[in-house]
Amino acid sequence: MSTYEQFANAFIVNSSFTGKALNVQGTSKLQQTLEKSTVSATAATGTINFDALTQAVLYYTSNASANWTVNFRGNGSVALNDIMTTGESLTVAFLVTQGSTPYYNSAVQIDGSSVSPKWQNAAPTSGTANSIGAYSYVIFKTGNAAFTVIASQSEFV
């Protein structure tokens, strides 16, 4: 059962709440969140579409077979540009399983257009063999079809 306490301006969920979006203004407290993830027995290669309306975390469990480009979008029919407003940011992660020959994320796109991320330390030039590469991206919308991306690569062996 959900209730709204007018005096405290609080929306209290005692069991569950289902909705398309929750817009909260001001400071919020969360005990915990569960992010939607997609786990796929797919090998990273070519251009990988990361659908932000589908997941916050994408995990490819088959060994990467080539360097890849990640393309961030809303989904196959909705642009990321259309679901974000200027001043918003989106944080996502892409996990890639590496075999004995490692590969890496060599390019980033948003809605099919190339962007130049600001990488922590430096852009990756390799992966790590027999590991899981974790790529984190924070995407800032700075204007119409204008984005700044900061990114990092970590390897878990």
Give the ranges of each region predicted by the language model:
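Short carbohydrate-recognition loop motifs
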Residues: 55-60
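Acidic, glycine/polar-enriched metal-coordinating patches/loops
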Residues: 63-157
